[in-house]
């Protein structure tokens, strides 16, 4: 028996396929999902979601949202998502560098908050890119 996993953003579906296991970056910590998991609704933070399908792990950078688990279906609704193998690592590193620079130089509260969010997003993208497609 498998899980049906969907990762959906406001403008596209990033993943829609069966899987054996899912690890979610819930706001309360990493959350592992296997078949026949109890029904669950959880908040998703900025981080890396991992999906094991066909015996191989795939990484997806996700940015804030919710996940619902019910009847062997995992539905993840997030603001942004990018599969690890599709991440432009150089662009993510540039975003991280820029965010770090703003944090080191700006005293504007709004700029610093945005820079912290950009930093989290960049780190998730880089981590997903490095995980790529592992067995």
UniProtKB/Swiss-Prot annotation:
Subcellular location: Cellular thylakoid membrane
Cellular component GO terms, alphabetical: plasma membrane-derived thylakoid membrane; proton-transporting ATP synthase complex
InterPro entries documented for this protein: ATP_synth_F1_dsu/esu, ATP_synth_F1_dsu/esu_N, ATPsynth_dsu/esu_N
UniProt-recorded Gene Ontology molecular function terms: ATP binding; proton-transporting ATP synthase activity, rotational mechanism
SUPFAM superfamilies with a match to the protein in the record: Epsilon subunit of F1F0-ATP synthase N-terminal domain
Keyword annotations of the record: ATP synthesis, CF(1), Hydrogen ion transport, Ion transport, Membrane, Thylakoid, Transport
Role summary: Produces ATP from ADP in the presence of a proton gradient across the membrane.
Protein name: ATP synthase epsilon chain
Species name: Synechococcus sp. (strain JA-3-3Ab)
Phylogenetic lineage: Bacteria, Bacillati, Cyanobacteriota, Cyanophyceae, Synechococcales
